[in-house]
Amino acid sequence: MEKRALFRSGWLPWLLIAPQMAVILVFFFWPASQAIVQSMQAEDAFGTSTSFVGLDNFVTLFEDPAYVESFKVTAIFSVLVAGCGIALSLVLAIFADRVVRGALFYKSFLIIPYAVAPAIAGVLWVFMFSPSIGVVSHGLRQMGIDWNHLLNSGQALTLIVVAAVWKQISYNFLFFLAGLQSIPKALIEVAAIDDAGPLRRFFTIQFPLLSPTTFFLLVINVVYAFFDTFAIVHATTEGGPGRDTAILVYKVWHDGFKALDLGGSAAQSVVLMAIVVGLTVIQFRYVEKKVQY
């Protein structure tokens, strides 16, 4: 039976949640409403005049080949970040769940990237992959790979994917490790008695029980790749070479603060907001229905 808290005063629950509601109103709903209004306006570069243009900014946006290309780059980037990040984190969590000696150091070491700011993470990786002084680029040259992400768009995309995956790996690792440790050991021991090997035990017992965690992390990682990687891209490639790594969130900033197209930039932010709302709905409505136990 579900228990509910009873309050003598009907206004007390509302009073308790009022501070949080105020934060949400000021820092989410107000900026979101401002972006929607601004996306339907055209403003000159000096901000002296504003005119209502309706949906013209959205029409111009989807007719722009650069925006369509940015959408494609973002889709590829998101798939790579989510796929590689989840797979690598799961492998590391499996090792952490089994390791005995040095377990505390191993787990602490894997949590460190989460404490690093995205901009700092981008700077660290751009130094390591620097064509002139980078340790990693030097090692790649020793292997016969001519690394220069400033000129090669494929290498630039690889760089931002690696940096983004490294930054998010701690978050994924913690959830997978918690999920693995919550699985009853008796199930695994029974499977071992039935001569099931490690791989079979993982794919028939552990991975199906981790499906809620995996689905949750899939949505979170896609949202992360779409919205929380601006600092990494800005610190590593600045959307280059050309605009080959200009993901959507970076293009919002570039068009708004560099090109001074405030209406177009606001329209792009509204599109991004619609994407995150859609992903959130998928997460909360289907996470219970689509997972396999």
How does the language model describe each region?
Residues 5-293:
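A structural signal for multi-pass alpha-helical bundles of membrane permease subunits
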